[in-house]
Amino acid sequence: SCPGIYGLLGNNGAGKTTLLNILTSRLHADAGEVLLDGVPMVDNDAALAQLFMLGEKNLYPDEMRVRQAFEATACFYPAFDIARAKALAARFGLNMKSKITALSTGYRSIYRIVLALTVGAPYLLLDEPVLGLDAQHRDLFYKLLIELYAEHPCCILLSTHLIQEAAPLIGHAIILHQGRILRNAPAEELLAAVHTVSGPAAAVDSYLAGRRPLSASSLGGLKTAYVEGPRPQAAPQGLETGPADLQGYFIALMEEESK
């Protein structure tokens, strides 16, 4: 349910970008249909106007300048806040006079980020939004995204490989693998259903007997495993148990699927 910040997670080729393109009618699904408030999205300009997708594909010609792109966006999205867009461009150091084709990979991402943060659409689909950004600009983006959601709650679908960085923002996780949805639940609920255990390999193996480990790794005589099931209140003697984090859980789940 929306509003909310949804994380769309998956390895390369899992189908994340394909799914986003289907949601925005850039691609047509082989089966099924996309509905918004119970209404089909295909050939529905009113419904599509409620969505804004940030992706690698440019909305405007490469020869257009950033300033001109902002002005064009105001024509298509009445809620677009061009004054705020200019202010954010200044914060990121984005030159409004630059042609889109002249922007570096990082600044192309920044240009798209500024549009997404100010367009005013109730549904934002962000496909790898921080591609090419340095750590400082990524941090600024995450802060601005939280500010946007706090001021104007909307539905944000964030596709990213930087799970550890984005995890604090994600309230609901959708995990894809080879075109299939493996998990689709609140992040807190997913992580409550798995835990880690570590210690001497023999003791860990004994602990895993009768349980379902997702993955395990060994270093010397020590072993660590991700285990499905709630974390026990007290760890067995000689072992340490802990909560799972979203990135570790994702990696463990991918390892389980690759078996």
Residues of each region from the PLM?
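ABC ATPase "signature
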Residues: N184-A185
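Conserved ABC transporter NBD signature motif
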Residues: S1, G32-A47
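ABC-family P-loop ATPase nucleotide-binding domains
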Residues: M53-R112
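Walker A (P-loop) phosphate-binding loop of ABC-type ATPase nucleotide-binding domains
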Residues: N11-G15
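Catalytic Walker B motif of ABC-type/P-loop ATPase nucleotide-binding domains
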Residues: L124-E128, L133
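Helix-to-loop junction immediately C-terminal to a conserved catalytic motif
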Residues: T24
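C-terminal coupling/interaction segments
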Residues: R212-S215, L219-K259
